[in-house]
């Protein structure tokens, strides 16, 4: 995104509940912590669902492909975990369809009243909605369960957390990918208490009725916890 910035002209400000971020005209990135930021901060599980999610549905072993965008790699990792919740007939919110998962050959199939096809061979609508719905439901359920056992960080825990984040962020030996992995590993030590679901074009390849049913499902997941957030980008 930095390629869209013009040095000396572009400024970006973000004011959050716990932190403020500023990208200055001079190209500096400034992070400012609000007072007692972590004492009120619900540690979130953040998921960005890219429009390219169809790619995961149609390619064999996408995890073996090199040079995938970071956003797609992160989504793919959660998608692989989410397959574990497909047991028996896993009902989809559209077309009275369900999913079946074969762990032995890592294959998802879409089933209807009179058909059963591999996801790779299904319509583009199914190829779009299945990864989105699976990951969203999996993470929503996972975070809701973690939130039952979450607790606010003590002052010592908050201090250690901030120091470790600062160390990772400022380590110039890390690549962006390594920094992201390190931050993810750090946050995994703590129970999440919010799910921030960022969905790009949820309507992609779906008929209007299916779009509506999908949105109802995403809102249902979002409403499980007060701290959850659903953010969508759309052309509809």
Language-model segments: which ranges?
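Conserved ATPase "switch" residues in P-loop NTPase domains
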Residues: 222-223
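Loop/turn-to-beta-strand initiation segments
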Residues: 193-195, 226-231
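Conserved D-loop-proximal element of ABC-family nucleotide-binding domains
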Residues: 207-208
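H-loop/switch region of ABC-family ATPase nucleotide-binding domains
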Residues: 233-235
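Conserved hydrophobic alpha-helix in the ABC-type ATPase nucleotide-binding domain
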Residues: 213-218
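Phosphate-coordinating catalytic segments in nucleotide- and nucleic-acid-processing enzymes
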Residues: 1-196
């Amino acid at each position: 995104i930095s390629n869209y910035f013009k040095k000396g002209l572009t400024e970006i400000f973000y004011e959050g509940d716990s932190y403020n971020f500023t990208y200055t005209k001079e190209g500096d990135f400034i992070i400012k912590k609000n007072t007692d930021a972590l004492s009120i901060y619900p540690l979130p599980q953040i998921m960005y669902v890219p429009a390219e999610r169809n790619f995961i549905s149609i390619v064999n072993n996408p995890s073996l492909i090199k040079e995938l965008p970071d956003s797609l790699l992160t989504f793919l990792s959660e998608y692989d975990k989410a397959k574990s919740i497909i047991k028996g007939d896993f009902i989809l919110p559209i077309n009275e369809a369900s999913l079946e998962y074969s762990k032995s050959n890592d294959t998802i199939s879409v089933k209807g009243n009179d058909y059963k096809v591999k996801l790779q061979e299904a319509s583009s609508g199914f190829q779009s909605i299945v990864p989105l719905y699976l990951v969203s439901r999996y993470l929503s359920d996972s975070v809701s369960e973690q939130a039952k056992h979450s607790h606010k960080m003590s002052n010592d825990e908050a201090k250690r957390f901030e120091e470790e984040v600062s160390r990772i962020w400022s380590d110039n030996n890390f690549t962006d990918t390594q920094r992201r992995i390190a931050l993810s590993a750090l946050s995994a030590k703590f129970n999440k208490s919010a799910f921030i679901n960022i969905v790009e074009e949820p309507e992609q390849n779906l008929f209007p009725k299916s779009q509506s049913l999908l949105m109802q499902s995403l809102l249902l997941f979002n409403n499980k916890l007060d701290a959850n957030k659903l953010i969508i980008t759309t052309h509809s």
